[in-house]
């Protein structure tokens, strides 16, 4: 028998490092490895040659440089057992990458970088035919000619400027990605042919060209400095960008606002305009919030009694069909959250639309729902009273007052309750709240919006620009107006453009000064750079110029600072951090207003009256943190009153399940479920290790180790003191902590009341622990999750 020498070396290295596995491999397996001289490999051009194990060894050894507790030979052995005669070179790469990724564990977390480097090597070979990336200018010329990049790049920048841009780039930063990040880049963000799988670029081209596109219209004397600064911020993960921007900026597609909020009126024309707008935006990567609260109830009269109204459910089904008609630009599946008030006459039928009981005719399961509450609803619950349900069409002025003026709403509500001529239904508040809590618990995706908090603690003046809905993921709160047709210039579709600061990459709070300036400038430029498929969206965006900048990696930030979600130790740090974030974002927008002018509808904001978030927050927060303000808010107030702000809103705290993987960060403000999460997506099963695992593993507070929602809700309330829009805040329940293994509805209601007391505007998922291994499959909801996730 003739043995292949490299193969014998592999086995010897393997046995030297791991002598205990000697008995695992029998003679037949060793023979299979050692006869690899009979294995041929099929090259990319179709020719065949003998497999070169030494070449493979060199690549894996390169990828393992400077990493701890990784074994080159273990990756080799795990790979080679899967080789076969005629295997393609690309399949060899995939096999080795998967072999390394399978070894990621709590004991050996650095395999996430070894597998990532191998994946980068493979990605570049696929894109360029070699590991070394091409020069920037010829690369851009080639892809513009192929129709993959937007031609404006060559019109806006000269060849000399491209040389300067190239000098800013550091392709070595590709090697800082984790495995989960590379797979997300391949699957979602890099420009590619989604039919053939052909990839045209690597990550640093993405980053430099996004920066170049966003600052293209800046003065030539300064724009390259901004491009360099923004490139460095995004390529070193200090600023995180959402899926639509990462996947779309630099391509001919020009719609990047993550969230779209569409309000529907109570007419067929408005319903059809809403549906048309949904289709246009879902096809361009956006997640949708639909306000359908105005639609009259089942049995209402139409055309002076000529017919009975069919009620809400047929129209909700119509919206569901529109949402699911397109995948989001080949990157995400369409998704929407639909909003209605708790006091709607059909509410008992609407609350159950998502559950698995009932029949197709009385269920609309593929939308999520946001139920709208206010102080009066909570008071009726606390006092043991009833809630009266109305059709909005029967109670003039009530629907608008629900958002604009709480005193007026209560007066009208009581007046209509006493009017026997109006159709209504009374239900005990506890029964209605219990039904809401049960459906929220059983589906996890019946959300909550406190519309009074959204309007009293808001940058907008509710008398002229009320907040009447939120978005898909419940972090956006912007004014909307119904359209009567899809080209109605008087309608208002709210768009919000997102990004986030990576708290884990921040050394001190002063850094937010420069980062906020870059983020606000880049996103503000995006508003002018993108297209608007519907006039109502262009009208609203140009008038208000709304941004939503949030955070990722909060759990790592707490772990790094030795504080926890559950015991109040993070409260003061959180207050200082979010004060700095909001202050520097407002300062940046104010500076931009000085340079370019305030947004045209600045007069519809409370900011124009000199009112800041620090003036309108819920004072209950002072009972959970006594941290004082540290920054010069009074000077900022004076400058905003004098010069305005460029952007009506600047902040929102969104989920970041996907883009946080690019930065190897924890998701948004959420605690991790495990130190290693195994996340399923259409790009495969990805292992992600929390940042600085070895050093901080004992500092992380895992989701299901947190005893209750109290501490988390306090932190969300502190954040909401400063954040001008709202927060995707979740509640989490472990049934094993409760008697009989069942979460009491009383506890769910208590948390809802606590959230209201703390001034929390919206509540997103209700998560229930299901007994599965928490580090294992954490289903990634991007396909159904919509683009307001970043």
Annotated model-derived regions:
Residues 5, 12, 19-22:
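Short hydrophobic targeting helices and cationic amphipathic motifs
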Residues 34-35, 47, 70-208, 212, ...:
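Core nucleic-acid recognition elements
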Residues 112-137, 456, 460-467, 758-774:
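Terminal amphipathic helices with adjacent charged low-complexity linkers/tails
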Residues 158-184, 474-480, 523, 527-528, ...:
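Catalytic alpha/beta core of large soluble enzyme barrels
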Residues 191, 198, 205, 210-223, ...:
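Function-dense linear segments that define catalytic or interfacial modules
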Residues 198-205, 209-269, 412-439, 443-448, ...:
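Gly/Pro-rich turn-and-neighbor structural signature
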Residues 352, 371-435:
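Polar, glycine-rich mid-to-C-terminal structural blocks
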Residues 516-538, 542, 564-656, 728:
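Internal maturation/activation junctions in enzymes
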